[in-house]
Amino acid sequence: MMTDTVDDVDLPYDKDSASQQEKITALQERLEVLETQNEEMRDKLLDTNAENNKYQQKLERLTHENKKLKQSPLFVATVQEITDEGVIIKQHGNNQEALTEVTDEMREELEPDARVAVNNSLSIVKRLDKETDVRARVMQVEHSPDVTYEDIGGLEEQMQEVRETVEMPLDRPEMFAEVGIDPPSGVLLYGPPGTGKTMLAKAVANQTNASFIKMAGSELVHKFIGEGAKLVRDLFEVARENEPAVIFIDEIDAIASKRTDSKTSGDAEVQRTMMQLLAEMDGFDERGNIRIIAATNRFDMLDPAILRPGRFDRLIEVPKPNEDGREIIFQIHTRKMNVSDDVDFVELAEMADNASGADIKAVCTEAGMFAIRDDRTEIFMQDFVDAWEKIQQEASDETEVSRAFA
């Protein structure tokens, strides 16, 4: 292919009449234009290559996904026995047993009761993780709550008992070994609503390095037979896998109420769930380095079987705070509040007679709302007085409504 000569190119000047300087200037201008065009074309080429690479990656991904979708599904089975002749497996669903050969490498990974994936010819393809209900796994708290013992007031004796029952066996097990006693296995917190039972459990989770697994008793109540019991088994299995661990069961009366002669299927399923919980708490399987905390507002409803020593060794009452406790709780909840110097916590504690910790927190929040309503950033003593009167009035109205519908 021949290159164009100067005579063949459309020159930006008249070659017969233009001077030498005009020719040079015109050619320089043409060169600048061509360089700009070349730069633009180079950028477009880079963009096109990048776009092409992106589509190429997408094509490879879709091809890989298409290949996976066309693969035959694998069946789930359980290893029954490992023999010299091979591995005996039982398929899930049809309970069909089969003897299959495995490689030496795969044989080392297998053990009885292990879950495996098998193909159409019942050859073991890979080992699967243990079957654990995902609902039990999501109950594990990854991040410690921000509640500490300093955030709890008026419960010094209860805090000491909880720490002895839960924290010390996890942090200093050698002390119990030297004394020659088994550490307490569980603690039950009971008392009126709003007295700080859940906060005590949160403080334990914050203080210990153990895995903290939280759940409500109502989460274990299920419609179909065996679901609640299975969730209890999986819950303790998750705790064993993450030892040391603390299991907190809130509102345990939902599954541990006194057994009756009721013949309804719902009551029977709740009782089966409780039986599984009792078996896990003191069954033949070693529970290991796992501590249990439970909380309830209805101690009178609990079944005696769950209260015996060995299941819950400590039954700790969490009462409403006394006057000194109420003063401390007021100080705790107002630490970050912009309170005036005229606020008298002793007088507030006397005023809020028979109030729970939750009531006091509500009073502090309502006092702040009164200040905001008056477009103030400082909270006065009168705001707390008005807040207490409002909380009392709301409680009185709720009582009247409940009586009307009783």
Curated annotation (Swiss-Prot):
Disulfide bonds: none annotated. ATPase activity is inhibited by EDTA in vitro. SMART domains: AAA. Transmembrane segments: none annotated. One of its GO terms (biological process) is protein unfolding. Optimum temperature is 42 degrees Celsius. ATPase activity is 1.5-fold decreased at 25 degrees Celsius and 37 degrees Celsius, 4.7-fold at 20 degrees Celsius. The protein is not active at 50 degrees Celsius. Pfam families: AAA (PF00004), AAA_lid_3 (PF17862). GO terms for cellular component: cytoplasm; proteasome-activating nucleotidase complex. Induction: Up-regulated at the mRNA level during transition from exponential to stationary phase. However, at the protein level, PanA is expressed at a high and relatively constant level throughout growth. Keywords: ATP-binding, Chaperone, Coiled coil, Cytoplasm, Nucleotide-binding, Proteasome. ATP binds at residues 194-199, 333. It is found in: Cytoplasm. Residues 404-406 are annotated as: Docks into pockets in the proteasome alpha-ring to cause gate opening. It comes from the Archaea. InterPro entries: 26S_Proteasome_ATPase, AAA+_ATPase, AAA_lid_3, ATPase_AAA_core, ATPase_AAA_CS, NA-bd_OB-fold, Nucleotidase_PAN, P-loop_NTPase. GO terms for molecular function: ATP binding; ATP hydrolysis activity. Its main location: cytoplasm. Residues 13-72 form a coiled coil. Belongs to the AAA ATPase family. Consists of three main regions, an N-terminal coiled-coil domain that may assist in substrate recognition, an interdomain involved in PAN hexamerization, and a C-terminal ATPase domain of the AAA type. ATPase which is responsible for recognizing, binding, unfolding and translocation of substrate proteins into the archaeal 20S proteasome core particle. Is essential for opening the gate of the 20S proteasome via an interaction with its C-terminus, thereby allowing substrate entry and access to the site of proteolysis. Thus, the C-terminus of the proteasomal ATPase functions like a 'key in a lock' to induce gate opening and therefore regulate proteolysis. Homododecamer, in a proposed two stacked hexameric ring configuration, but may also form homohexamer. The hexameric complex has likely a two-ring architecture resembling a top hat that caps the 20S proteasome core at one or both ends. Upon ATP-binding, the C-terminus of PAN probably interacts with the alpha-rings of the proteasome core by binding to the intersubunit pockets. Interacts with SAMP1-MoaE conjugate in vitro, but does not bind to SAMP1 or MoaE alone. Interacts with NcsA. HAMAP family: PAN. The biochemical properties of PAN 1 are highly dependent on molar concentrations of salt with a significant loss of ATPase activity and complex dissociation detected at 0.75 M NaCl. This is Proteasome-activating nucleotidase 1. It comes from Haloferax volcanii (strain ATCC 29605 / DSM 3757 / JCM 8879 / NBRC 14742 / NCIMB 2012 / VKM B-1768 / DS2) (Halobacterium volcanii). The gene is pan1.
